[in-house]
């Protein structure tokens, strides 16, 4: 009795089909498993990136007005390990409720004088820093150090270096670097993106604003503000220590509208201008003329990466 070819090959065809399906399922399983492992690792890394690197007893004190991307500013510093924020909020009512709802933020609402703001801002900053020191002594947040920066500045580095300072060190300072952009940024751009940074404090650095850094001090009765860039201590016998493990990224006028409004505000003066920066003086003169073309030229000249 003859067996037909189709009957002879049918079991082999079925076996081959099952084997092929098994191979496909195995490959699918391997691919899916590897993808899920990769995705799990990515999620874990993102989670770790958004959690504090170090639980510190360091706080930030700042005086702010119409800040851009305040959520980013807070989150970056929380991730760094900042314990508490002491914020004087000027003429920004839309932010009051939000900041007051943050458990790690102490808010005081204030206002500007509106005249001679280059000098007046520094006067109010000095007063607020000293008030923040007093608040930190009594509020139970266990903040042992305060660092003074602005809302267009981001701290980078290792806060543990602050906490490891010996008891006889009462104040310290950190160098600033200044953001440069590859185009004139607009409202849609996040404030804290830069194409490069100029190393302030070095010769021909390209920094157009301040270059002498920012500072921090112990929360103690002997420490107080000594201008917007330094702290002083009544008992410290040596010069303020420079911390090389921290730096301040300064995103000066991080979009054109902020730049324009800033220098319109600074242009309201009733006394002689003694600002030492060409960038500031040229911008103030253009703002007085309300000349957007000239303002853009100045921004391009000083703030855009060459």
State where each predicted segment sits:
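N-terminal anchoring/stem segment of glycosyltransferases
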Residues: 38-114
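Catalytic-site signature of metal-activated, phosphate-bearing donor transferases
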Residues: 122-130, 140, 157-306
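The conserved acidic donor/metal-binding loop of glycosyltransferases
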Residues: 150-154
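Terminal signal-anchor or tail-anchor transmembrane helices
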Residues: 12-36
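Short acidic/polar active-site loop segments enriched in Thr and Asp
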Residues: 83-84, 144, 170
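Active-site-proximal specificity loops/subdomain of glycosyltransferases
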Residues: 95-146
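Short, low-complexity, Lys/Arg-enriched N-terminal segments of secretory-pathway carbohydrate enzymes
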Residues: 1-11
């Amino acid at each position: 009795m003859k067996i037909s070819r189709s009957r002879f090959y049918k079991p082999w065809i079925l076996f081959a089909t099952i084997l092929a399906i098994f191979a496909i399922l195995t490959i699918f399983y391997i691919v899916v498993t590897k993808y899920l492992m990769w995705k799990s690792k990515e999620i874990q890394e993102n989670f770790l990136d958004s959690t504090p690197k170090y639980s510190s007893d360091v706080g930030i004190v700042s005086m702010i007005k119409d800040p851009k991307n305040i959520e980013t500013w807070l989150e970056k510093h929380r991730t760094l390990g900042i314990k508490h924020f002491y914020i004087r909020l000027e003429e920004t009512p839309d932010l009051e409720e939000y900041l007051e709802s943050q458990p790690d933020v102490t808010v005081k609402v204030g206002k500007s004088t509106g005249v001679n703001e280059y000098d007046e801002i520094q006067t109010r900053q000095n007063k607020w820093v000293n008030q923040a020191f007093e608040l930190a002594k009594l509020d139970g947040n266990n903040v042992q150090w305060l660092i003074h920066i602005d809302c267009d500045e981001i701290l980078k580095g290792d806060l543990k270096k602050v906490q490891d300072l010996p008891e006889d060190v009462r104040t310290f300072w950190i160098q600033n670097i200044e953001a440069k952009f590859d185009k004139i940024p607009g409202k849609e751009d996040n404030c804290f993106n830069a194409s490069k940074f100029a190393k302030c404090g070095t010769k021909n650095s390209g920094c157009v604003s301040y270059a002498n850094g920012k500072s921090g001090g112990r929360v103690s009765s002997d420490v107080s503000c000594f201008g917007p860039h330094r702290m002083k201590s009544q008992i410290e016998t040596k010069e303020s220590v420079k911390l090389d493990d921290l730096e301040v990224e300064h995103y000066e006028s991080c979009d054109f509208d902020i730049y324009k409004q800033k220098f319109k505000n600074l242009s309201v003066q009733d006394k002689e201008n003694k600002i030492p920066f060409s960038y500031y003086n040229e911008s103030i003169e253009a703002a007085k003329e309300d000349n957007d073309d000239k303002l853009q030229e100045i921004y391009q000249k000083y703030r855009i990466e060459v």
